[in-house]
């Protein structure tokens, strides 16, 4: 679920960067996505997009699926409930952890995707 994902990001990065900073970053962070990721953070977003696609193949609706999770320290932890919820939660938790580890390059925010994402 998009709202829960936002909170997971805040958990993993200890509130150092707001979730909206990732909405228009690189070629894959935010709606859509194409081309070659511009950096490590953008690769995190592509992996997350691909994970959501896989979840959708199983009949899940990742952007709308509510799941159970906890923030333990700086690690989002999923609480098992069902296959669909667990899958989506795992997608979001992995992405949030990836975001927290990847450098944020301000030059890759709000880029011209038509020219840079081929």
Swiss-Prot record:
Major localization class: secreted
Disulfide bridge map: 11-71, 27-117, 29-45, 44-98, 51-91, 60-84, 78-89
Tissue occurrence: Expressed by the venom gland.
Positions bound to Ca(2+): 28, 30, 32, 49
PANTHER family named among the record's database cross-references: PHOSPHOLIPASE A2, PHOSPHOLIPASE A2 FAMILY MEMBER
Localization per record: Secreted
Transmembrane segments: none
Enzyme Commission (EC) number: 3.1.1.4
Names of required cofactors: Ca(2+)
Entry protein name: Basic phospholipase A2 PA-13
Gene3D superfamilies: Phospholipase A2 domain (1.20.90.10)
UniProt keyword terms in alphabetical order: Calcium, Disulfide bond, Hydrolase, Lipid degradation, Lipid metabolism, Metal-binding, Secreted
GO biological process: arachidonate secretion; lipid catabolic process; phospholipid metabolic process
Taxonomic classification: Eukaryota, Metazoa, Chordata, Craniata, Vertebrata
Co-factor note (free text): Binds 1 Ca(2+) ion.
Pfam families in the record: Phospholip_A2_1
GO molecular function (one): calcium ion binding
Gene Ontology, cellular component aspect: extracellular region
Role noted for this protein: PLA2 catalyzes the calcium-dependent hydrolysis of the 2-acyl groups in 3-sn-phosphoglycerides.
Catalytic site: 48, 92
Domain of life: Eukaryota
């Amino acid at each position: 679920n998009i709202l829960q994902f936002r909170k997971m990001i805040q958990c993993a990065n200890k509130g150092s960067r707001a979730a909206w900073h990732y909405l228009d970053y690189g070629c894959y962070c935010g709606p859509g996505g194409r081309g070659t990721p511009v950096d490590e953070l953008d690769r995190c977003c592509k992996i997350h997009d691909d994970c959501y696609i896989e979840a959708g193949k199983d009949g899940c609706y990742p952007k709308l699926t509510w799941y159970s999770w906890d923030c333990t320290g700086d690690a989002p932890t999923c609480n098992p409930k069902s296959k669909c919820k667990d899958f989506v939660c795992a997608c979001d938790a992995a992405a949030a952890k990836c975001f927290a580890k990847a450098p944020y390059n301000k030059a890759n925010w709000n880029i011209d995707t038509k020219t840079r994402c081929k």
